[in-house]
A protein has these predicted regions:
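Hydrophobic helical membrane-anchoring modules
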Residues: 2-3, 192-278
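Structured catalytic core of nucleotide-sugar glycosyltransferases
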Residues: 5-142
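Residues at alpha-helix boundaries and short interhelical turns
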Residues: 16, 70-71, 185, 189, ...
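Conserved amphipathic alpha-helical interaction elements at protein-protein interfaces in regulatory
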Residues: 31, 35, 65, 69, ...
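Structural signal for short hydrophobic segments within the conserved structured cores
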Residues: 75-77, 164, 203
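Acceptor/aglycone-binding surface of glycosyltransferases and processive sugar-polymer synthases
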Residues: 79-81, 85-95, 102, 114-191, ...
């Protein structure tokens, strides 16, 4: 049962052109598994699942090398093409769902602190089905990145999309939480907007975000804006309400203008324009 230390953990890592960090990430995450197994908190056959999202570099070759060197602890999934971070992460979670009891998703750049995975597992053992990794501060981000990220969460909030502030996709999910998530038929995936809808007991762990160990950020402004659009269009009726409201106001103003023009015409005060043509 839960808390017995027999639960099998799968650490799901979406990868897109991560050849510079993959070996470092694998070593760090294997260290986490070894530590948790040694402490009796997870099953001995717990593993890391790297999801190759159509990388153009040597990412997949390195995943294969890691699997050959560590066949129990490292596995890989190769997607047919580049489907994007959210779909790659979803593919990894659904693959891991049948192979594990609990999952932790984390990006390959290791900016999220792997040390708090133990705290996530402890909260899982205490009954939580979803544990969010939340950044305390964004000191390592550039001013531009920090400002756009804060703007992202503010827009989400204004549009009525429920998200956990300063949480990206570093989270623990129990098997039943992943099963519940897999039932959603969303085409515009925005996982951090979907998680609060699942229900079940949730909690947070807090950590300081680090700088990338190597390589470049895979979330430039363009992708961030696309993610925001997906979140708003998938989880908020506010844009529809706003468009509907604007439409109603325009119709009312048009009717009032037509009535005014007609009255002016009938009383002889011709408004220059179309009423003089009647």
């Amino acid at each position: 049962g839960r808390g017995s230390g027999m639960e099998k953990l799968a650490i799901v890592v979406p990868c897109y052109n991560e050849e510079e960090v993959l070996k470092i990430a694998s070593e760090a995450l294997r260290g986490v598994l070894d530590d948790l197994i040694h402490k009796g908190k997870i099953a001995e056959d717990s593993f890391i699942l790297f999801v190759n999202d159509g990388s153009k570099d040597r990412t997949w070759e390195l995943i294969e090398e890691e699997h050959q060197a560590h066949p129990v602890q490292v596995c890989g999934v190769k997607l047919a093409g580049n489907v994007g971070h959210q779909f790659a992460l979803t593919a990894g979670l659904i693959t891991a769902m049948d192979l594990s009891d609990v999952t932790v998703s984390i990006d390959a750049d290791l900016q999220d602190d792997v040390a708090v995975i133990e705290e996530m597992i402890d909260k899982f053992h205490n009954g939580c089905d979803i544990v969010y990794g939340v950044r305390k501060e964004r000191k390592t981000d550039t001013f531009f990145k920090r400002t756009t990220a804060q703007g992202f969460y503010k827009v989400m909030e204004l549009m009525g999309v429920k998200t956990v502030y300063n949480h990206a996709d570093f989270r623990l999910m129990s098997k039943r939480a992943v099963e519940q998530f897999s039932k959603y038929q969303e085409t515009n995936l925005f996982l951090r907007g979907m998680m609060p809808l699942i229900g079940y007991q949730t909690d947070c762990v807090y950590y300081d975000r680090k700088e990338r160990v190597a390589g470049e950020s895979k979330y430039p402004l363009k992708k961030m804006l696309a993610l925001a659009f997906n979140g708003i269009s998938s989880f908020s009726v506010k844009p529809i309400s706003m468009i509907l409201g604007a439409g109603v106001i325009i119709v009312i103003l048009s009717i009032l203008a037509a009535i005014y023009a007609l009255i002016s015409y009938c009383t002889g005060h011709v408004v220059p324009g179309w009423t003089s043509l009647i």
